[in-house]
From Swiss-Prot:
Chief localization: nucleus
Region (Leucine-zipper): 81-102
Cell compartment(s), UniProt: Nucleus; Cell projection, Dendrite
Organism: Mus musculus (Mouse)
Protein name: Protein max
Keywords, in A-Z order: Acetylation, Activator, Cell projection, DNA-binding, Nucleus, Phosphoprotein, Repressor, Transcription, Transcription regulation
Keyword Acetylation: yes
GO biological process, one term: positive regulation of transcription by RNA polymerase II
Amino acid composition bias (Polar residues), ranges on this chain: 107-124
A single GO cellular-component term on record: nucleus
Keyword Endoplasmic reticulum set for record: no
Length: 160
């Protein structure tokens, strides 16, 4: 096995039978040294992967402890981010539902006015009031008005 090979521990049985005891011992020592060097390099790599240990001297026990803490921290952080993603998906679905309801209300308002569709009619409600993309376009006391502020409050509560 050459020095450039990846860490592969060869057994002494793979070597020719005619080696002397000293040769076998030297070969075994070289394999053991290579194994220890690989473990040492792996600990250094792990140490450098943990932000609180980067570039510092630390014992193997400290490296393992800090790596465990960091992994647990990252798991909690990932869980929190996943919850945020799920909340945003729910909010997005609610907003898409509101958009569909507003588009439906707009199309029914256009049918009620019996005016040909023009760019100006796209932005007015059934009573001729201006529809804003931010206020939901409701200038009337329709049934959807009480529901809209409740859903907005709910969205704010979920986000916090």
């Amino acid at each position: 096995m050459s020095d450039n090979d990846d860490i592969e521990v060869e057994s002494d049985e793979e070597q020719p039978r005619f080696q002397s005891a000293a040769d076998k011992r030297a070969h075994h020592n070289a394999l053991e040294r290579k194994r220890r060097d690989h473990i040492k390099d792996s600990f250094h790599s792990l140490r450098d992967s943990v932000p609180s240990l980067q570039g510092e001297k630390a014992s193997r026990a400290q490296i393992l402890d800090k790596a465990t803490e960091y992994i647990q921290y990252m798991r909690r952080k990932n869980h929190t981010h996943q919850q945020d993603i799920d909340d945003l998906k729910r909010q997005n679905a609610l907003l898409e539902q509101q958009v569909r309801a507003l588009e439906k209300a707009r199309s029914s308002a256009q049918l009620q006015t019996n005016y040909p569709s023009s760019d100006n009619s796209l932005y007015t409600n059934a009573k001729g009031g201006t529809i804003s993309a931010f206020d939901g376009g409701s200038d009337s006391s329709s049934e959807s008005e009480p529901e809209e502020p409740q859903s907005r409050k709910k969205l704010r509560m979920e986000a916090s």
